[in-house]
């Protein structure tokens, strides 16, 4: 079939298998162009491995350090009349490239929150790798069925305490408008922490340790975001921010767990980027469109893959210890949060309207990057060609 992008709201409901593979290959080529990451990880588990920062971490580990990787994700295969999700095609593209390079790559498609998937993954590590020396935790999920209680928790992206009104942009139509988001209830706050907080990360790490599957000096990292004050009510001080606070609590507990064997656990605070997760957050896409324009002009713009390659090469495997901030986090949002960048954002933000959106922001770059997440707009891909969307997981 011939596959074209079809965007509904903040999601593209089609994805292109050849384009997704080309996008992954572009990331692989970037990592290889930066050279070998000396003393990098060799056996890596990536929980949330099919898109965004998780996929970029897997690519960096494999093609920067020659690591064997196990990827866990929850993606939908194609069925009659329906394409697979981009993460499905991404993971196949990655796995083909890794195996062609002689690297071990194994995939588990299922609910990472469940005991069943944890057991399957632990059995695979025991059988194939013996132990892992790096665990990446990069899940972004709208819901979690708690493995102990069976309760289904659903996360929400809302402010806490009071309604929040600010500008937002419909990235499809380019209309800039005001949006008011009502505050979360106590139940919604608790549910969001249950989904996006640190409990599941702890369950994974304790299961790995109890089964003796963590190598000496093993590291684990989870990803977070802080951002500028304009996004704080809906992010840092909102429901998702409270969940990220719980993730930081878990990082400290896991760091204490790993310290006796020379390991460490920490949070990396990443840059605002166009991802399937960030596109769903009100206000944030407009901020990203402004940020991209400023950072591209300064020559400091990074995508997921540049961020993760820099995290691995200059912090985690730099021959020394990572550089931590005052609360023990690694800050690879440093270029985004540079005072002069944020001053420029604050200057542009109040002036943006529907009429001047294209001139004042990089909405074109946002849209292009958004479509690339789904395999569209990749150079060298013939989008008029007939392609088979039904590809089994490998």
UniProtKB/Swiss-Prot annotation:
Biological-process GO terms, alphabetical: fatty acid biosynthetic process
Binding site for substrate: 225
Top-rank taxon: Bacteria
Disulphide-bonded residues: none
Active site (catalytic residues): 235 (proton donor)
EC number: 1.3.1.9
Recorded metabolic or biological pathway in which this protein acts: Lipid metabolism; fatty acid biosynthesis
Keyword annotations: Fatty acid biosynthesis, Fatty acid metabolism, Lipid biosynthesis, Lipid metabolism, NAD, Oxidoreductase
Substrates-to-products reaction catalysed: a 2,3-saturated acyl-[ACP] + NAD(+) = a (2E)-enoyl-[ACP] + NADH + H(+)
Site (Plays an important role in discriminating NADH against NADPH): 75
GO molecular function, one term: NAD binding
Binding site residues for NAD(+): 48-53, 74-75, 111-112, 139-140, 244, 273-275
EC class name: oxidoreductase
UniProt cross-references to InterPro entries, sorted A to Z: Eno_Rdtase_FAD-bd_dom, Enoyl-CoA_Rdtase_cat_dom, FabV-like_NADH_b, Trans-2-enoyl-CoA_reductase
Family membership: Belongs to the TER reductase family.
Role noted for this protein: Involved in the final reduction of the elongation cycle of fatty acid synthesis (FAS II). Catalyzes the reduction of a carbon-carbon double bond in an enoyl moiety that is covalently linked to an acyl carrier protein (ACP).
HAMAP family, per the entry: FabV_reductase
Subunit structure comment from the entry: Monomer.
The protein's name: Enoyl-[acyl-carrier-protein] reductase [NADH]
Native species: Opitutus terrae (strain DSM 11246 / JCM 15787 / PB90-1)
Organism phylogeny: Bacteria, Pseudomonadati, Verrucomicrobiota, Opitutia, Opitutales
